[in-house]
Amino acid sequence: MKKKIISLFSGAGGMDIGFSKAGFETAVAVEQDPSCCATLRQNLPGVSIIEGDINKISTLEILKVGKMKPLEPALVIGGPPCQSFSLAGKRMGLDDPRGKLVLEYIRVVQESLPVAFVMENVKGMTNWSDGKALDAILTEASREIIYDGKVYKYALSYEILNTVDYGVPQFRERIIIVGNRIGKKFNFPMPTHTSPLESQMDLFKTSENRWATVWDAIGGLPPAAEPSETALRISRTIKERIINHGY
């Protein structure tokens, strides 16, 4: 039997797909955006999806839809919205309603009591307000929880990882926070890939260890057709939205 996951801020289901390849199964996913939910249904057929604002969704409802009780989930996974911590935004942190969604994530963890949780967010979370936001998040996530007469507490580990160091053709630094109620610190995996320069300097490195490139990932695709008028119009609309997004 596969280990059950509660997926929060699921987006298109990228984390879910990754964990499914590691032997886990998403029991319930929570996502507000209708387009993301439509994509989720394609990527995760048969998975129960709660479409709505997590501020208005109780942990009891999440567990009920996922057909679980507290202590039964193996994992809670997700990446709460990162705009309030992003170096590219106004960086309002926990003063931004979106920043407070991190606390909603922790609320679901504390009330569902999974064996472990994995949270992903932008690197900027580590230095917002001289690290006070991260300290507040870690303090809240590690506090003692009393359930059914027993006390539980999550042991936390965090690290800033770059996806390019693990075979992804993209420089993408993210903080990964892992907590477990077993009491053991999580050891993050060592990088599997290095820069071409490092590979050349180390005789024991092979070509498979070098950073992957975009060509490695999509070089075998057939040539793209000429864009249609519809595609060009949509592209212009998206560009205007990016310019005027207000962050």
Region annotations inferred by a language model:
Residues 38, 60, 106-111, 146-152, ...:
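Short C-terminal domain-edge/linker segments immediately following a structured domain
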Residues 56-59, 87, 96, 124-127, ...:
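Generic structural "secondary-structure junction" signal
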Residues 100-181:
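Conserved Class I SAM-dependent methyltransferase catalytic core
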Residues 49-50, 114, 150, 227:
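Secondary-structure boundary/capping residues
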Residues 2-26, 71, 140-144, 170-247:
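S-adenosyl-L-methionine-dependent DNA methyltransferase catalytic core
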Residues 2-113, 123-136, 142:
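Core alpha/beta nucleotide-donor-binding catalytic domains of modification enzymes
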Residues 27-29, 76, 117, 159, ...:
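Generic beta-strand hydrophobic packing signal
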